[in-house]
Amino acid sequence: MGVKQIFMSFALLATLYQADAQEKTVMLKYGDMNSWVTRTIHESAIIGGNDKTLYEVGPNKHLDGNHAYRNLGGSPWGTSNVMAKVSGITKTNNCVYKEKRGNGYCARLETHIERVKVLGLVNINVLAAGSLFLGDMTEPITGTKNGEKYQNCGVPFTSRPKALRFDYKFKSSGEPDRIKLTGFGGSSVVKGKDKAVVMLLLQKRHEDAKGNITAKRVGTMVVTYDKSTKEWINGMTCKILYGDIRKSPEYVEETMKLRTIDYARNSKGVNVPVKETGWASDNETPTHMVLQFLSSHGGAYIGSPGNTLWVDNVKLVY
């Protein structure tokens, strides 16, 4: 190797080192998944009267009793683990679990069938997917329709990160199609293999005098997983795309299009739909970040039992 080639090699290494040194990562609060709130809920006698454990990402603490949960310790994380009170009956659902990983913990998100037996006779079966997201749930859940309205989706956020970074592991159910199981009638087939989803959206929101919320899409990152991993994938880094990305080769209409199905709590304390009305310019500053990890895709009551997504060490890259 000549002197010129040696010099160029050193210059390249120096450039790479400088670029790496300039990269900044910020762990989301409680994003290391090492700290959890554990709740003990007593279900109604008519459905068995069992004590059930629910997990929430937050400060290490145990809560005993059928009390509505509000995020503790400044935790930005909500889960699909909920307590419901419908027609005077208290019932729980837990799809997100605290699981040991090395010297700490991670989150395990599962899709399963929640089975309820009333007076030991009537069976009600509902498909439930694991969801870990930035925001919170409004408890208790008081109805079986339009479950999204209980979710306050997104948190205030005004930065412009380059990427989302996290550790993950995925186990597919192996089924070629999904099912829809609402608790009323039997299950139906939904064509297409189930996928886990990781979604980060940056939005510039606006609330009108009536409390309605609209948003322009500032940043977009959506990845899906349908093949099992043999082991943990550490430091998965997913680029955030800014502005109108519809002509980008990375744009996937099905998962990245503008959304109108999410809810957020307005200034009046009411959960209302967030309607994305367009794409912001690529240099716009957001007001909110939406981040969700999901063990299944396709909407409420849809998925494949057995789909499992593990998540740990959630960071933003600048």
Located regions from the model:
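Aromatic (Trp/Tyr/Phe) and Gly/Pro-enriched flexible surface segments
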Residues: 22-159, 191-205, 209-243, 253-297, ...
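Substrate-binding/catalytic groove segments of enzymes
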Residues: 176, 245-252
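Extended, low-complexity, turn-rich repeat/linker tracts enriched in Gly/Pro/Ser/Thr and Asp/Glu
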Residues: 170-177, 188-193
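Bacterial Sec-dependent N-terminal signal peptides
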Residues: 1-27
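A short secondary-structure junction signal
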Residues: 176-181, 211-212
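Sparse recognition of residues in long alpha-helices and their boundaries
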Residues: 49, 181-182
